[in-house]
Amino acid sequence: MTRGKLITFEGPDGAGKTTVLERLVPLLQAALGQTIVTTREPGGVAIAEKIRQLILDVSHTTMDDKTELLLYIAARRQHLVEKIMPALEAGHLVLVDRFIDSSVAYQGAGRGLDKQAIQWLNHFATDGVDPDLTLYFDVPSELGLARIAQNTEREVNRLDLEQLDLHQRVRKGYLELALENPQRIVKIDASQDLESVVAAALAAIITHSQA
C-alpha cells in the first residue's frame, strides 16, 4: 500500500489556520477522493490531550521554557505513534494543525531556546518523519492578536497572555523557516479574507498532490 501524505498547518496565533483546515476537508475529499484524517498538536490522542491541558493552563504561569518544550515533544511523540503513523501507513491524507515547526518558532525564536537542540528533539520524537508539505499562514502579529481578542468563542490559553514582542519573534521564526525550506513550506497570506485563504491553501495542496 502506498504511504499517505502528511500535510501540516503552521502559523502564529490568530492566523486562522484551524478554520482553514476545517473548511478544506470537504473540498479536498471532493477533489482528491481520498480518506482524510485531521488532528492537532498538542493533542490528537488522549495522552497528548492531557499534556495539552498542562501546557495551556492559564494558572501555570511559572512553567519553565524548557519544561514547556519537553511537554510539547512528549505530546508529539505519542500523537505520532498512536495516530499519525497508523493513518499514513493506511494510505490516508493526514492534515495536522501544528507540528515540528511550531516548536522551532515558539520555543526557539519565541522563547530563545537553542534551535539545534529543538531540531534534534523533533527528530528524536518523530524518528525523522517530516511533513510532505507545510502550509504556513502568515499574518502580522498585531492583526493576529486583534483577531483573537475579537473571537468570543475561543477559550483563552496561557500563550494568549504573552506580550506582543513574543508573537513578533514567533512570526520572524516562521518566516526564517519558510526561507530555509522552500521545497516543503508554502507561505500563504492569511491577512486576506477567509475565502481567498482557503482557495490558496486548496490550490497548494492540489498542486502538491499532482507533482
UniProtKB/Swiss-Prot annotation:
What stretches pass through the bilayer? none
Catalyses: dTMP + ATP = dTDP + ADP
**A GO molecular-function descriptor:** dTMP kinase activity
Question: Where is it found, in Gene Ontology cellular component terms?
Answer: cytosol
Chain segments annotated as coiled-coil in the UniProt record: none
Q: Which Gene3D superfamilies match?
A: P-loop containing nucleotide triphosphate hydrolases
Q: What does this protein do?
A: Phosphorylation of dTMP to form dTDP in both de novo and salvage pathways of dTTP synthesis.
Protein name in the entry: Thymidylate kinase
